[in-house]
Structures are given as structure tokens and as C-alpha cells.
Swiss-Prot record:
The lineage of its organism: Bacteria, Pseudomonadati, Thermodesulfobacteriota, Syntrophobacteria, Syntrophobacterales. It is an enzyme of class 2 (transferase). This is Queuine tRNA-ribosyltransferase. Its EC number is 2.4.2.29. It comes from Syntrophobacter fumaroxidans (strain DSM 10017 / MPOB). It catalyses: 7-aminomethyl-7-carbaguanine + guanosine(34) in tRNA = 7-aminomethyl-7-carbaguanosine(34) in tRNA + guanine. Substrate binds at residues 91-95, 145, 187. The keyword Metal-binding applies.
Length: 373
């Protein structure tokens, strides 16, 4: 992996970079569409590439349970399995274990849990997480960590953070695939001193990149922003900085302001399937009756396939009729919006105009459409 900073904005910590993996180069800050089960829901790999996606995320937990990492390896690895020739980042499985599965035990060795699919009992340790991610063959792997819940006491957050640090060291020791980069994950809940302590310890171990985990897990926006502002700028400047599972367009803008390079979130794809579509002025719920006779596209001037061809009225009809095309068209638009948002921020940073761009971004959102019915 090679990561280089191309430009910095003088008004804040925002930075424009370029990251090269074994499967290509992409510009940062970047948004990674989530391909939970070796698929970004409703879209083909060719469509993702046409949208301008250069890296996607795969979920180790889901792929471990079905179809199994060993099977994916036998079939040539995740890139070949899903016919995606660009970069892939896999998470460690930690977040899904703590959010989806029924946990039986958290031990020093790892986590024993029951599958959310069939109730079968499994265990994930730092070593098995690394083995799975190496079998999948992603370009970037994540250390196995404990996803700290919210709310927790300071004492538990510290205990959890220290366990994550120990698991990170074991993850690094077990990781033996040279062409696959390994990122450490900074934990500590909403306690900024614990986050800084965790970061110091991870830097001592040494990783190719560093991520902030366990954000947007129930804490307030103010608490999340406080952690971002206090910790993100202190992540090693020469390494990629990643905030996991975040978030809204506003979250991405504030993350970039704080110096974050990489983001992933299910929001654009999940919201698309629920009929919530993103525009520069905010979100619209396409099922609302006000769009029944609306002949306009989702967003005037949007160049996505959906907006160039279809009206809000048609999209509303498809959604209410539960036509599969609704999910595809909505997803195409939402990912086009998210990827375009990142491109606009990269351009603003390169022009040393991020602060002005950010003010314009929020001004547009103040001019929302009238309240929906």
C-alpha cells in the first residue's frame, strides 16, 4: 500500500490524498459503498464502477457465516468471487458480532456468539479474524476489536479499550499476507482520553492505517463530533485515517474537516431501499403523497441514471408497488450523491477552499423543500 498527501486545506485539517493498493489507486477522502455479503445490494459491479466507486467494503462476519471464507478462497478470493477488480476493505467482524449476534461470552481469547442466521455457535478471535480476511484476500484488513457499546461506564470503556489493544497486537502477529494492508482500530467510547491512550498504544505496535471505531452507535451527534475533533487530527499524518460506519452527509463533511480520509456506511443503500433519497437540500421520502404527480427528477441537474430518465412520480409508484426496480434506481441515485459529495470535497480541498465550500453545503441544506405531508 502506498499513501500520499496531495493537498491540505489551510482552514482546517482537511486533506486530499491518493492511496494505491494491489487492485488500483483511488483518491481520498473517499466513501466506500458497503457490500455486506459480497454484493452492494441491488447493483452489479459494473454499475458500481460506472458510478465512480474505486473501493468497497466487505463484511467478514457475514462472509464467515455464509458462504464461508474457505469456500471464497477456494473459488479464487473475494475479488474473483464477486467479479470486482478494484480495491476491497474487509472489516474484522467485530461490529457485527456485537450488534447482530447473540453473544455468549467475551473472553481474553475472543468472542463466543450465536449466528443471527441459524443460531449456530461460533467463536472469533484475533487469529481467526485474520485467517478469514487473508482467505478473502481483501486489499485492506482490519484488526479484530471490541466494539464498545453506548452507554458504558468509564471503567468498562477502559477495560474494553485495553482488550482491543491486546487483540490488535495479536492480529498483527497473526497477519502474514504481505500484499494485504492491516489497519488498527482506536476504541475508548466517548472518552477522549481513552481514545488518545488507545491510539498511542496502537502506534507503538505499528499499523498501515488507523481507524476510529464505535462511533454512531447511540451517542449524540455532539458526542461523536467531540471525539472526531479531539482524536482524528492526532491520527498519524502519514497514514490513511478511517472512520468506520459513519454516516450522514453532514457526518462526512465534519469528518473530512477533522482530517479523515476514508468512510463507509450502509446509509445510502439502506435508505434507498426504504425510499429516502438524498439531495443537496436534504432528504426526501419518495412515498409521500406530494410526489404522486411530481414530474421532476429527484434532483434537478443531477447526472445520475435515475435522475436523467425518471420522475419522482414514477419512483413513488415503483416504491409503493414494491417493484425491484425501485430499489435499484434509488440506490443508483443515493450512491451517486455520496460519491459526488466526496468528489466535491476533494476539489474544494485542492483549491484550498474547503471552508467556503462547507458553508455553501450547509446553506443549501437550510433551503429545504416545504415540510412533507
Amino acid at each position: 500500500m502506498d499513501f500520499r498527501i496531495i493537498a491540505r486545506d489551510a482552514s482546517c485539517h482537511a486533506r486530499r490524498g491518493r492511496l494505491r493498493t494491489a487492485h488500483g489507486t483511488f483518491d481520498t477522502p473517499v466513501f466506500m459503498p458497503v457490500g455486506t455479503q459480497a454484493s452492494v445490494k441491488s447493483l452489479s459491479p459494473d454499475e458500481l464502477e460506472d458510478l465512480g466507486a474505486h473501493i468497497i467494503l466487505g463484511n467478514t462476519y457475514h462472509l464467515l457465516l455464509r458462504p464461508g471464507a474457505e469456500r471464497v478462497a477456494r473459488l479464487g478470493g473475494l475479488h474473483r468471487f464477486m467479479h470486482w477488480n478494484r480495491s476491497i476493505l474487509t472489516d474484522s467482524g467485530g461490529f457485527q458480532v456485537f450488534s447482530l449476534a447473540r453473544i455468549n461470552r467475551i473472553e481474553e481469547d475472543g468472542v463466543v456468539f450465536q449466528s443471527h442466521i441459524d443460531g449456530a455457535r461460533h467463536a472469533i478471535t484475533p487469529e481467526t479474524s485474520m485467517e478469514c480476511q487473508m482467505q478473502l484476500g481483501s486489499d485492506i484488513a482490519m484488526c479484530f476489536d471490541e466494539c464498545t457499546a453506548y452507554p458504558v461506564t468509564y471503567e468498562y470503556a477502559r477495560e474494553s479499550m485495553l482488550r482491543t489493544v491486546r487483540w490488535a497486537a495479536r492480529s498483527k502477529e497473526a497477519h502474514t499476507l504481505p500484499e494485504q494492508s492491516l489497519f488498527g482500530i482506536v476504541q475508548g467510547g466517548v472518552f477522549c482520553d481513552l481514545r488518545r491512550d488507545c491510539l498511542e498504544r496502537l502506534v507503538e505496535t505499528g499499523f498501515d492505517g488507523y481507524a476510529l471505531g464505535s462511533l454512531s452507535v447511540g451517542e449524540s451527534k455532539e458526542e461523536m463530533l467531540s471525539v472526531l475533533e479531539a482524536v482524528a487530527p492526532g491520527l498519524p499524518a502519514a497514514s490513511p485515517r478511517y472512520v468506520m460506519g459513519v454516516g450522514t452527509p453532514e457526518d462526512l463533511v465534519e469528518g473530512v474537516r477533522c482530517g479523515v480520509d476514508m468512510f463507509d456506511c450502509v446509509m445510502p443503500t439502506r435508505n434507498a431501499r426504504n425510499g429516502m433519497l438524498f439531495t443537496v437540500r436534504g432528504g426526501i421520502q419518495i412515498k409521500n403523497s406530494r410526489y404522486a404527480d411530481d414530474d421532476r427528477p429527484i434532483e434537478e441537474g443531477c447526472s445520475c441514471y435515475t435522475c436523467r430518465r425518471f420522475s419522482r412520480a414514477y419512483l413513488r409508484h415503483l416504491f409503493l408497488a414494491r417493484e425491484l426496480l425501485a430499489y435499484r434506481l434509488n440506490t443508483l441515485h443515493n450512491l451517486h450523491y455520496y460519491l459526488g459529495l466526496m468528489a466535491a470535497m476533494r476539489e474544494a480541498i485542492e483549491a484550498n477552499a474547503f471552508d467556503r465550500w462547507r458553508r455553501s453545503f450547509y446553506l443549501d441544506r437550510e433551503n429545504r423543500e416545504p415540510a412533507e405531508e
